[in-house]
Amino acid sequence: LRQVHLWNLGFIKDKTKGKYKEIEDKISDALAFMEACGINSDNNRRLRSVNFYTSHEALLLPFEESMTRIDSTTGEYHDTSAHFVWIGDRTRQPDGAHVEFCRGIKNPIGLKCGPTMKPEELVRLCNILNSENEAGRLTLISRFGADNVQKYLPKLMQAIKKEGLKVIWSCDPMHGNTIKAATGFKTRPFESVLKEVKNFFAVSQAEKSYAGGLHIEMTGQDVTECTGGAQKISEDDLSNRYRTHCDPR
């Protein structure tokens, strides 16, 4: 944070840099005030360390199983490959191996919900994966595509609410908006990503449900993998810095 003024702002248009400069100054002022009060990283451990959590899809079951350990004090199973693992939209069969594995571990888990998810199937999966209806145990990650959110999400939220199931609702605006550009690259229009996020929040508000998070694929690299955005990246620009080996970030 002390180096915030040196962060790369090349992606920001000139007319918006003033807003970020103001935020930078406020951060620097806050740190200076804390220093003046005698609070610094030398005498406060919280200022020199962070809680860092990892997450990934529990797709390769031989790997996940090899990383699973038993807590000798409780007898519970924990998947040590990540703090939070999720089940993909294509591997969420109620009687499938991925669901069976995830229901047996104590990690918080996620479940991707796409356009083919039926309300009754979702309720069944919730009862399997979170049989004790424990708050914080199960996160439902919607991924419909920008134009399908209002068609599918309300019914799922209504079914969960009717059954009194305790879940966290999250939004994945990436996977439902993947397209193939004319140039052959797999990409995602930023405008579609943003639209799905806005529609997710709108439906959550209408259904009186709490919007609990976003699932976004990002990278610290300077890439040109999604079109649009602040730089208005075109399909022709994708080849400039297309680095991903899988999905566009």
Locate predicted features.
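Extended C-terminal subregions enriched in glycine
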Residues: 142-220
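Active-site-facing alpha/beta catalytic cores
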Residues: 1-145, 185-188, 195-197, 210-217, ...
